Each structure stands twice: as C-alpha cells, then as structure tokens.
Amino acid sequence: MCSPFLILFLSSLIFSATAEASHCSSTGLPLVRKISELPQDNYGRAGLSHITVAGSFSHGMREVEVWLQTFSPGSHTPIHRHSCEEVFVVLKGSGTLYIASSSHEYPGKPQEFSIFSNSTFHIPVNDVHQVWNTNEHEDLQMLVIISRPPVKVFIYKDWFMPHTAAKLKFPYYWDEECLQAPIKDEL
C-alpha cells in the first residue's frame, strides 16, 4: 500500500516537470526528471541543500510545491511562518521541530517534537516554526510539500518577537531569480 505522501510526490514528479530549458519556465510538456539533475543550491545558508522538485516557477505548479531539503548536523531553518500549509516527510536523519501558535501577540516558548527517519509532520497556516538537525553525525533530509506557492515567509529574530515585527522575505531565496513583487502580511 502506497502512502498518500508518496503518491503526491510521484504525481508531482510525473506531471509537473517541463520541457523548457529555463529555470523559471512555467510551460512545456510533462517530463520525468532525475532529482540528481535538478538545480541544487544553499542560497547562502550554510548547511542547507535545497532542490525544488516541483515548483510554481520551475514547473508551472499552482496548488502545491515540492522541495527536497538536506540539513547538515547543527543547521536549521530560521524561526518563521508562512500563509500556506506545509507537510514534511523525513527521509533520513533526525532532529527537532519547534512550533508555536500565531494566535497571540508573539509566538512565545515553542513546543518541541522529535522528528526522525520515516516520520511525517505538518505545519498549519501561519504557525511559527523552526526545524533543527540536532543529530551530530547524520544529515537530516526531508521532502517538503507546501500549498499555495510561491511561499511568502515572515522571519523572526527570536520566539518573543511580535508577529507584526516579523520581516517578510518575498520572494524567498529560491524564487528570487523568477519573481520580484511586493506582498503584504496576511495576518
């Protein structure tokens, strides 16, 4: 029996890749592509390897976007939130998810959850979160699916920064090449 996440991932791979050569292309025929041949970058973030497997700009996706992200030991995402749902499938490694609600003036002390190979978790719309690779000996690799691409990220300096003070990063690093447009906070 296939998991829904595997079906979503495989469907995205089969139906979303395009025949166009441009990284920012959104038209073309569906293709099957090797993940190892897709563009990979860390976008100036030490310890990160990001591949857009199926993206709004790279592949014309409108409802979901799929990433393959690898974090080296000790690396992490920023404390952030976004106006989309997010699903993670941990492919290898282990780490910690920190998450706090956006229902108060600021996130506050986050809840902590252990994440590990073959686990999955989701982030509700606008919940403030951060993922750390807390394993000293192994990379943390995750398949990430977001709704409503392209992602609009609000970054926090710490867990006690008011939501209204969070800094918008849009377009996000992997979308900068393809999109330049101002966007307002949706909270």
Q: Where are these predicted regions, by residue range?
A:
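Conserved short histidine dyad/triad with adjacent acidic residue
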Residues: 65-82
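Short beta-strand His + acidic residue motifs that chelate non-heme Fe in jelly-roll/DSBH
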Residues: 77-79, 97-99, 123, 129-136
